Amino acid sequence: MWKLRFLALLALPALPALPAYGQSTLSDAARRAQQALSAHNAEALVGSSSNVVLQIPGADPSSPLGRSQAIELLRRYFRPAEERGLDVTAIREVEPGKGFVELTRRYVVAGTTELRHETLFLGYRLQGRDWRLVELRSAP
C-alpha cells in the first residue's frame, strides 16, 4: 500500500498545472470581455474593477475613471453602434500579473450601412485570483 502512495506522489509533478477553483485565466477574461462587448454590457465589461483608463472617443485618456463613470462612458460609446462581429485576435501575459487582450470589432452606426472596423486593446491586472480590466483603448 505504501508503495502505491509513493508512486502516486512521484507522478504528481508530471500532471499539468490547472487553475485553482475560482481562479480565472487571461483567456477567461478575454472570453468574458468579448461577450460583454458583443452585448454592449458595460457593467460586465468593467466587472469588479475600481478604476479604468478609457481611451475611446468621448473620454479624457489622461486619468483613470471610477467604476460608475467608466460604465456610463462605455454605455454612451456603445449606444449608436450595431455590432456585426467581434473577434479576439491576441491574448498575452506580458509579465506576471499583467496582460492584454486585443479584439477586432466590426460594426455599423445605427441608421447607416457603412461597415466600420476598430481594434480594441484591453489591459488587465491579476488581482487575487481574477484578471481585472484596468485600461481600454480604441484604435481605428
Protein language model features and the residues they cover:
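Solvent-exposed loop/turn segments at secondary-structure junctions
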Residues: P61, Y107-V109, A139-P140
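Short, low-complexity N-terminal intrinsically disordered segments enriched in polar/charged residues
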Residues: W2-L4, L9-L12, L18-A39, G47, ...
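A short gly/proline-enriched turn/hairpin at secondary-structure junctions
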Residues: L54-P64
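Short, well-ordered alpha-helical segments enriched in acidic and aromatic residues
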Residues: N41-V53
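A short, structured loop/turn motif at beta-sheet edges
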Residues: H40, I91-K98, Y124-D130
